[in-house]
Amino acid sequence: MKIAILKKPYCIEIEEKKLKAKLAPDEIRAKTVVSALKLGTDRGNYEGAEDVPGAPTYPRWVGDSNIAIVQEIGSEVGEFKVGDRVVSQNPHQSEWIAKESTNICTIPEGVKDEDAVWSTLYTLSAYCYTKANFIPGENVAVVGLGILGLGAVAMGPIFGAKKTIAVGNSEVRNDMAKKNGSRPFCFK
């Protein structure tokens, strides 16, 4: 399989790696179709930021959100079958093996790969509502309109926010937030 490895700042290489041939009973093997960048973290890794969580030294793998097709399943796997489209939190690699119990989820029919690939990041946005003990009917202010902030804006109506106020410094991102029902406030 091939995997994107960040060797040093501004230097990504595609490496060939061997996956084990035999699966454990609770593992699946899948082939990646689409992989998404984690925009802030991957950019920080690429630019050599010192404070990227979980990545203290080089080489670093990048990415943690991909869409794949299940190619093979272990003898005890019950949730997935060969041919299933799944979303996972694996790095940018062409093929992977993971335990059935890890963060892997079947993608419903009708959901495009390009939309589903963001779902792992949007779960972080949704978690903000849980962590804040949000109560439906309250107002929400989202400060920062990166991918996680825009996800939090999109989650406002789903969680029952009365109003969602989006605070950012980009006209483009404020427009995106507005399309999701927020009232943008732009700092320049």
Question: What positions do the PLM features span?
Answer:
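Conserved catalytic-core motifs of eukaryotic protein kinase domains, centered on the activation segment
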Residues: 42-43
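Mid-domain Rossmann-like dinucleotide-binding core that forms the NAD(H)/NADP(H) cofactor-binding site
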Residues: 112-187
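Residues that mark the start of a beta-strand
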Residues: 2, 27-29, 139
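A short beta-strand micro-motif
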Residues: 3-7
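Short glycine/threonine/proline-enriched tight-turn/helix- or strand-capping micro-motif at secondary-structure
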Residues: 11-18
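NAD(P)H dinucleotide-binding glycine-rich loop of Rossmann-like/cofactor-binding domains
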Residues: 59-67, 71, 79-143
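Residue-level recognition of beta-strand termini and adjacent short loop/turns
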Residues: 8-10, 24
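Glycine-rich beta-strand-centered segment in the early N-terminal region that forms part
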Residues: 21-38, 47-90
